[in-house]
Amino acid sequence: MAHDVVLIPGDGIGPEITQAMRRVVEATGVQINWNVQEAGAGVMDEFGTPLPQHVLDAVAETKVAIKGPITTPVGTGFRSVNVALRKHFDLYACVRPCLSQPGDGSRFRDVDLVIVRENTEDLYAGIEFDEGAAEVEELSQLVERSGQKTFAADSAISIKPISIAKSRRIVEYAFEYARRCGRKKVTAVHLSLIHI
């Protein structure tokens, strides 16, 4: 049985990387029907956005996508394609397994951990205002009224929302993942000095 997978090659080194990935997948013998969709700087002229709706529709239909690196054109008013994909599909858990391999040359032996990171809040929320935007002035006034340290008039602003609900959701995900995969320990890491 073949599996339908959306492939977003991206731009820059993306097509080269995704082509190598395809060769690796093909070597496994797993049958894949690749639905190649273009996104990033290369589609801006044709579609007026780095992430056209038909790409989102294709991913929604297959529920599986592999994406290469994608450039978001700077100064175009568009958020990062990565952030847009995370928000659109609520891809809140970034799961990164880390496993030592024999002969890898690392000074750290027997590494076997999985990093689970919240992927839609904090700076990943993509709430940003360019220098000179009216929102920057409004935020500056709000900060000043609250008695906090002000920031330079020529600042750009990025807001880092962190909610109880989404914090709880990622913690629950980490514990469920640990149970499901037979892991015995979950460690929370955060920068408390930044958020006091």
Model-derived segments and their meaning:
Residues I32-P52:
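N-terminal beta-loop-helix "entrance" segment that forms/cooperates
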Residues D11-G14, K63, V116, A174:
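Buried hydrophobic positions in well-ordered alpha/beta secondary-structure cores of metabolic enzymes
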Residues A2-E38:
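N-terminal phosphate-binding or glycine-rich loops at protein starts, especially the Walker A/P-loop
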Residues D4-G10, A65-P69, V186-S192:
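Short glycine-rich or small-residue beta-strand-to-loop segments that form or flank ligand, phosphate
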Residues I194-I196:
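Conserved small/polar residues in nucleotide/adenosyl-binding loops
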Residues M1-A2, V59-E61, T150, V171, ...:
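Glycine-rich phosphate/diphosphate-binding loops that line cofactor/substrate pockets in enzymes
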Residues I32-V36, R180-V189:
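Flexible, glycine/charged-enriched surface loops at secondary-structure junctions
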Residues D45-R145, S155-K160:
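N-terminal glycine-rich phosphate/adenylate-binding segment common to multiple enzyme folds
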